Amino acid sequence: MEPVVMEIDHYIVHYGTVSDREAPNREYVRIDCFYRGAKVGQILLGNSVNPGNYASVSNGEIHLYFPLEQFANIHAVLQGASSGGIALYLESDPNGEPSIGGVRRER
């Protein structure tokens, strides 16, 4: 299948903590990704993130999930989003299930 690719020209980083009785004070990062003012996806990182899958398409947006330790690497790729060439991508297996997803930078 052809990969789903969403170009990014702007992003917002949210850093926070999730507190509940079972696992207090778990950190997370959410990066909302936009293209021409419309949200095209999000990247969630952290030990509070427990998705059923690590990449998906939801309501026309690419959603990616990573361990918090990957934040510096992902943020480094996102630097320069306003100058173009940055995109979220998602590849699926022959059954249409997400298999690979990430952030790419073209130069």
Residue ranges and their predicted role:
Residues 65-107:
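Short, compact, well-ordered microdomains
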